Amino acid sequence: MLDTAELAEILTGLRERIGIAPGAEVTLEANPDTVTREGLVQSANAGFTRVSFGMQSAVPAILKTLDRTHTPERVPLVVQWAKEAGLSTSVDLIYGTPGESLADWEASLRAALSYETDHISAYSLVVEEGTKMGAQVARGELPTPDPDDEAAKYELADALLGEAGYAWYEISNFTRATDADLASGHSSTFYAHASAHNLAYWRDWDWWGLGPGAHSHVGRMRWWNVKNPAAYAARLREGRSPAYAGEILDEDTRELERVMLGVRTSEGIELAGLPGTRQADEAGAGLGAGVASGGRVAALIADGLIDGAAALRGRAILTLRGRLLADYVTRELMGY
């Protein structure tokens, strides 16, 4: 792990060699038990503007299952330190951990809300092969995450966060809405505390990844660096690219990804021209008539998956139910 001084050195190098735009978001991700008050102050002085803490849960037993080393009591302390340093704050939560009850999840949500951070992320647990938890699930030592349980927990998160003044701008991300945000009509374009880093992915912007294992995406090209830090450093010393492999995306894949990512946001995506809406367009009926006369879009509205009023304005914006079934909505919009 890089310490504060090393992170500051990297940021200084980027500023001198490439340049950092005025007002740019510069986020530091940290485990609650690896940061200090002094380190957060130094990070802010170096140019970091935001810190995201991996809280995950407020329940000790769940943290143990997730192999997290911090205690629940540590999180409000480091959040307060970050605020005092002048950093925007965020916490990441995970739901669906084996053994987690709905009451456990509610306790974690209420704890996170009590810290009054600017931003909260709530991710469903992904059990990956090759991990300790993946092996435990495969052996039957831990139960497989239950989709219905995860849906109930997401609905609870949406309700509690909404009541507390947090607005969703991407399925897993909620931001504390300021007065200016509310006046703007809840467009994530204007959310002061929405993560620019997250939005870059959901809006299909280009990005460059630096460091071992980092991924980059520019236009139709996508590539990733070698994962081993020693191999990464050796390539740089030898004047070689650290890129290990890559791919060129065809137009169909790019369109699928644009829809799949864009539909996850509270801005939604334009319906016109999508494969699932072209039948009405080609018939000369226009999208509005297509919505009213049946077809995929009308079915999505009838099933309560996309907002009907937004669809009549030409945009697909997910309802709460639609957020739970976003992959299905994507397939329908793509005409699969």
Q: Where are each of the predicted segments found?
A:
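Short, amphipathic alpha-helical interaction segments positioned at domain boundaries
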Residues: 320-336
